[in-house]
């Protein structure tokens, strides 16, 4: 079972995916919590390039190919083996993030992205995608507050993008959800975290019949 979490910067994905993982584990499920870009040593090295705010010269097509390379390695090394063993895999971002950020956000042709995603994913697709939705002003406000309180290495290249960019990403996510309503569940990320967690648990229960 493969569940992915998506949303704009500052939507609360990391908090909510950890809460779901804990709930599933408490219910006796075997769970793997991972993320993209990253999730294994090689993919984490690629992540450091992709998210480093100093890498302003990174062009959209190179960015896209780095995401595809990271995904291919992560799937082969981490996700595919876990799924083969019957583990529930929870992934913070996956192929929909590439569609939202690199196609809707950057303007790369959707078919180019679908081709690369197909190669990188090798037939693996999520059973359920949780889209945490909030206004871009809310999400960026949270994200930048987090950055201001963080010390050490920072991964903020996307947080520094314009409001218009993030609006395109949000609109893209909502369009993707409309295209595949059977896979996506949209959760209001502006309410209290406990309410968000409850809505996610309900979605997992109703769509995948997993005790939470």
Swiss-Prot record:
<comment type="function">
    <text>Phosphorylation of dTMP to form dTDP in both de novo and salvage pathways of dTTP synthesis.</text>
</comment>
<protein>
    <recommendedName>
        <fullName>Thymidylate kinase</fullName>
        <ecNumber>2.7.4.9</ecNumber>
    </recommendedName>
</protein>
<dbReference type="InterPro" id="IPR027417">
    <property type="entry name" value="P-loop_NTPase"/>
</dbReference>
<dbReference type="Pfam" id="PF02223">
    <property type="entry name" value="Thymidylate_kin"/>
</dbReference>
<feature type="binding site">
    <location>
        <begin position="7"/>
        <end position="14"/>
    </location>
    <ligand>
        <name>ATP</name>
    </ligand>
</feature>
<keyword id="KW-0067">ATP-binding</keyword>
<dbReference type="GO" id="GO:0005829">
    <property type="term" value="C:cytosol"/>
</dbReference>
<keyword id="KW-0418">Kinase</keyword>
<dbReference type="GO" id="GO:0004798">
    <property type="term" value="F:dTMP kinase activity"/>
</dbReference>
<keyword id="KW-0547">Nucleotide-binding</keyword>
<keyword id="KW-0545">Nucleotide biosynthesis</keyword>
<dbReference type="GO" id="GO:0006233">
    <property type="term" value="P:dTDP biosynthetic process"/>
</dbReference>
<comment type="similarity">
    <text>Belongs to the thymidylate kinase family.</text>
</comment>
<dbReference type="GO" id="GO:0005524">
    <property type="term" value="F:ATP binding"/>
</dbReference>
<dbReference type="InterPro" id="IPR039430">
    <property type="entry name" value="Thymidylate_kin-like_dom"/>
</dbReference>
<keyword id="KW-0808">Transferase</keyword>
<dbReference type="InterPro" id="IPR018094">
    <property type="entry name" value="Thymidylate_kinase"/>
</dbReference>
<dbReference type="GO" id="GO:0006227">
    <property type="term" value="P:dUDP biosynthetic process"/>
</dbReference>
<dbReference type="GO" id="GO:0006235">
    <property type="term" value="P:dTTP biosynthetic process"/>
</dbReference>
